[in-house]
Amino acid sequence: MESIEQQLTELRTTLRHHEYLYHVMDAPEIPDAEYDRLMRELRELETKHPELITPDSPTQRVGAAPLAAFSQIRHEVPMLSLDNVFDEESFLAFNKRVQDRLKSNEKVTWCCELKLDGLAVSILYENGVLVSAATRGDGTTGEDITSNVRTIRAIPLKLHGENIPARLEVRGEVFLPQAGFEKINEDARRTGGKVFANPRNAAAGSLRQLDPRITAKRPLTFFCYGVGVLEGGELPDTHLGRLMQFKAWGLPVSDRVTLCESAEEVLAFYHEVEKDRPTLGFDIDGVVIKVNSLAQQEQLGFVARAPRWAVAFKFPAQEQMTFVRDVEFQVGRTGAITPVARLEPVHVAGVLVSNATLHNADEIERLGLRIGDKVVIRRAGDVIPQVVNVVLSERPEDTREVVFPTHCPVCGSDVERVEGEAVARCTGGLICGAQRKESLKHFVSRRAMDVDGMGDKIIDQLVEKEYVHTPADLFKLTAGKLTGLERMGLKSAQNVVNALEKAKETTFARFLYALGIREVGEATAAGLAAYFGTLEALEAASIEELQKVPDVGIVVASHVHNFFAEESNRNVISELLAEGVHWPEPIVINAEEIDSPFAGKTVVLTGSLSQMSRDDAKARLVELGAKVAGSVSKKTDLVIAGEAAGSKLAKAQELGIEVIDETEMLRLLGS
């Protein structure tokens, strides 16, 4: 007679086998009723013997107790986004860039996949067992959705097969099939619940439930498309090979993944999928095209937030016609005046659209747009609504001219348009309430100073009540003053004050990004910080010297130089420093006085380190006389390559620069 342990093992193995056949192979061999019977039998046995329940048992998908809030998971390897192309000409230009950059006659084979319209997730397996899952978040840090992901039947709690790595991070898309989406909305209408606009919103809402038991009731599914962390094992040296290996281990992979031998075959695949799109049973918004060879991927490397070896070829956005009821003018963080069309609300690609960007005065002139016109609206990239064209044949008689303002609609300051620029700007600077609001929202944002709990509505009120005029004023706020805002109790106010205090400790790169200098994004801010090291050096830099920083041209250099030349900006920076904003200062050491293999060398770190943080490694290298740079150039002496090193490693190899790994770095640090 079999023991209870043997019965449980057999039932779990049988259920996992049938889950694999159903979700991965799409070839179920037993009726749903038989699957349900086996599940009931397993559940009954586990109820009688709770001490024998294992975390990877199929019964453990039903969901744990509700969470108070999501915790954060830092991605060991950043989850980058993809660059987009929207037409054949742009794709062919991308194809040419890839061929040119490879600088060889070696053939490029493309692996093409469906671009699923769902939620990107990262799933970590240790010794084949699912241990954690996270959303993409900002690419560096995501939300811990482990409990919810465990409820998705398509995702195995335990991988099966041979040669499974000790640590394997699988990346893919969680999405909701059309049938499941329609059923959720049908149930919601019947019970008075929330009706979702589209399957993507429904998938996101289902996956980000604090109560996993709700997620368990939603028919979410999953396809994997890539890998993050890989330790203690190997994977094939092609992208398609890796996907097929994932499938062999029990992970679901789309059956539409296709290998294309040329750009022409890629375009044929794109048009085939576009034709089949309505019958797939789930939403996609394009195809993803990747260089199949991992060696070529490594050679091509990355730009700031995207790989050079992949692109998303988006489908033309859905379009609808409606009427322009008015045109209003919004003022952005840098004073840019943006015309916005107020529309007769219309559903476009599952979303009710009532506003659309008109970009600038030139665009209004190009369109020949008048208030009252009938227009075609497109959700560009299925996200940002825009006016495509005016239906002139149906123009009403009572249309009105759109008059671009000569004075700021918010503060009344002059509006000027610099020759050669399409954008007109308010000249009011921070005396303009709109610019002040947007500048402050940028300053406190997650990727800038990261002030937790200070949302847009709080900033709006602070500006409207004249409590805050510059970023430095934020750090002068008290809990007592904040309680004067709507829906702000003493406890919430104190939390904001505490968050502001915590935000004072930052990095030089984050501080530069938070200042909101025109054209200075995160990557440029990091480059400037790494190159100059100190605020004083950056403030004193000439336009010519600024252009020595990688990826900084004359336009960006001019904006940076002009920003620091402006006395009011320097005053704000002085106030911020006086309020206690600080970051680790580089230690200046005479390299000639140090007996170290790193002394006097320009060193670049790339990839992720496992034994110490990047910041700790940089600090130790500087202590030993090295200059740590943010990018690889002919002046670089040494590159330290951690896990998943990308474009910097490729460039170092191309330039013949010495490369060492983390183990060798640690040995030299200790020598």
From Swiss-Prot:
<dbReference type="InterPro" id="IPR001679">
    <property type="entry name" value="DNA_ligase"/>
</dbReference>
<dbReference type="InterPro" id="IPR004149">
    <property type="entry name" value="Znf_DNAligase_C4"/>
</dbReference>
<feature type="binding site">
    <location>
        <position position="432"/>
    </location>
    <ligand>
        <name>Zn(2+)</name>
    </ligand>
</feature>
<dbReference type="InterPro" id="IPR001357">
    <property type="entry name" value="BRCT_dom"/>
</dbReference>
<dbReference type="InterPro" id="IPR013839">
    <property type="entry name" value="DNAligase_adenylation"/>
</dbReference>
<dbReference type="InterPro" id="IPR012340">
    <property type="entry name" value="NA-bd_OB-fold"/>
</dbReference>
<dbReference type="GO" id="GO:0005829">
    <property type="term" value="C:cytosol"/>
</dbReference>
<dbReference type="InterPro" id="IPR003583">
    <property type="entry name" value="Hlx-hairpin-Hlx_DNA-bd_motif"/>
</dbReference>
<dbReference type="InterPro" id="IPR004150">
    <property type="entry name" value="NAD_DNA_ligase_OB"/>
</dbReference>
<feature type="binding site">
    <location>
        <position position="113"/>
    </location>
    <ligand>
        <name>NAD(+)</name>
    </ligand>
</feature>
<dbReference type="GO" id="GO:0046872">
    <property type="term" value="F:metal ion binding"/>
</dbReference>
<feature type="binding site">
    <location>
        <position position="314"/>
    </location>
    <ligand>
        <name>NAD(+)</name>
    </ligand>
</feature>
<keyword id="KW-0479">Metal-binding</keyword>
<dbReference type="InterPro" id="IPR033136">
    <property type="entry name" value="DNA_ligase_CS"/>
</dbReference>
<feature type="binding site">
    <location>
        <position position="290"/>
    </location>
    <ligand>
        <name>NAD(+)</name>
    </ligand>
</feature>
<dbReference type="InterPro" id="IPR041663">
    <property type="entry name" value="DisA/LigA_HHH"/>
</dbReference>
<dbReference type="GO" id="GO:0006260">
    <property type="term" value="P:DNA replication"/>
</dbReference>
<feature type="domain" description="BRCT">
    <location>
        <begin position="593"/>
        <end position="671"/>
    </location>
</feature>
<dbReference type="InterPro" id="IPR018239">
    <property type="entry name" value="DNA_ligase_AS"/>
</dbReference>
<dbReference type="Pfam" id="PF14520">
    <property type="entry name" value="HHH_5"/>
</dbReference>
<comment type="similarity">
    <text>Belongs to the NAD-dependent DNA ligase family. LigA subfamily.</text>
</comment>
<dbReference type="Pfam" id="PF03119">
    <property type="entry name" value="DNA_ligase_ZBD"/>
</dbReference>
<protein>
    <recommendedName>
        <fullName>DNA ligase</fullName>
        <ecNumber>6.5.1.2</ecNumber>
    </recommendedName>
</protein>
<keyword id="KW-0227">DNA damage</keyword>
<dbReference type="GO" id="GO:0003911">
    <property type="term" value="F:DNA ligase (NAD+) activity"/>
</dbReference>
<keyword id="KW-0464">Manganese</keyword>
<dbReference type="Pfam" id="PF22745">
    <property type="entry name" value="Nlig-Ia"/>
</dbReference>
<feature type="active site" description="N6-AMP-lysine intermediate">
    <location>
        <position position="115"/>
    </location>
</feature>
<dbReference type="Pfam" id="PF12826">
    <property type="entry name" value="HHH_2"/>
</dbReference>
<dbReference type="Pfam" id="PF00533">
    <property type="entry name" value="BRCT"/>
</dbReference>
<dbReference type="InterPro" id="IPR036420">
    <property type="entry name" value="BRCT_dom_sf"/>
</dbReference>
<keyword id="KW-0234">DNA repair</keyword>
<dbReference type="InterPro" id="IPR013840">
    <property type="entry name" value="DNAligase_N"/>
</dbReference>
<feature type="binding site">
    <location>
        <position position="173"/>
    </location>
    <ligand>
        <name>NAD(+)</name>
    </ligand>
</feature>
<comment type="function">
    <text>DNA ligase that catalyzes the formation of phosphodiester linkages between 5'-phosphoryl and 3'-hydroxyl groups in double-stranded DNA using NAD as a coenzyme and as the energy source for the reaction. It is essential for DNA replication and repair of damaged DNA.</text>
</comment>
<keyword id="KW-0520">NAD</keyword>
<feature type="binding site">
    <location>
        <begin position="81"/>
        <end position="82"/>
    </location>
    <ligand>
        <name>NAD(+)</name>
    </ligand>
</feature>
<feature type="binding site">
    <location>
        <position position="411"/>
    </location>
    <ligand>
        <name>Zn(2+)</name>
    </ligand>
</feature>
<feature type="binding site">
    <location>
        <position position="136"/>
    </location>
    <ligand>
        <name>NAD(+)</name>
    </ligand>
</feature>
<keyword id="KW-0460">Magnesium</keyword>
<dbReference type="Pfam" id="PF01653">
    <property type="entry name" value="DNA_ligase_aden"/>
</dbReference>
<dbReference type="GO" id="GO:0003677">
    <property type="term" value="F:DNA binding"/>
</dbReference>
